């Protein structure tokens, strides 16, 4: 079973957002350090920090364009001497919107900015499509507070894997 804990902070201005995600995977059987939550040493941490820049186009053509680069953590070369700066580029478009229900489809590809001696990146064994998404969201309202709940399927054609995810946004400051 895959398990992770995410902290993030984001800033938004008009159609742009800038975010920093701190992702810590504590899945059983991981091949990296997943037993020291507060370890932030580049050579031995089980986490990674992801810097993300998004642009949401205007409402007439509501396309989300995203660029995400892992700037720290377990995105290292084989010798563990350099960060690979794996980068994920993504497009997402709403395919259905009605009242409190939304459905979105997306596609993303990955590559490493620093090859560091190999063709691999954090998301796959080579450059290419690593993310195909279909997501359904319901805007649940409780005491005048909206908390979006989503369910999504994600496919990684390069790795021949599929994932199911459930999530809720408890608050938005």
Predicted segments with their positions:
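Outer-membrane pore/translocation modules
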Residues: 1-92, 112-127, 159, 167
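Short loop/turn motifs that connect adjacent beta-strands in outer-membrane beta-barrel proteins
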Residues: 12-15, 19, 56-63, 93-105, ...
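Outer-membrane beta-barrel "beta-signal"
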Residues: 134-136, 160-173
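Short, exposed beta-strand-loop hairpins at the edges of beta-sheets
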Residues: 153-158
């Amino acid at each position: 079973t895959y398990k992770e804990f995410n902290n993030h902070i984001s800033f938004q201005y008009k159609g742009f957002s800038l975010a920093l995600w701190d992702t810590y995977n504590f899945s059983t059987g991981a091949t990296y350090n997943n037993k020291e939550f507060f370890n932030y040493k580049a050579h031995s941490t089980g986490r990674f920090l992801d810097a993300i820049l998004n642009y949401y186009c205007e409402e007439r053509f509501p396309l989300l364009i995203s660029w995400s680069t892992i700037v720290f953590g377990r995105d290292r070369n084989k010798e563990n001497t350099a960060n690979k700066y794996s980068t994920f580029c993504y497009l997402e478009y709403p395919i259905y919107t009605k009242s409190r229900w939304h459905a979105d489809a997306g596609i993303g590809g990955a590559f490493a900015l620093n090859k560091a001696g190999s063709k691999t990146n954090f998301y796959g064994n080579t450059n290419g499509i690593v993310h195909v998404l279909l997501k359904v969201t319901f805007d649940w309202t409780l005491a005048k507070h909206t908390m979006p709940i989503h369910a999504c399927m994600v496919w990684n054609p390069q790795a021949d894997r599929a994932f199911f995810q459930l999530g809720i946004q408890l608050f938005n400051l």
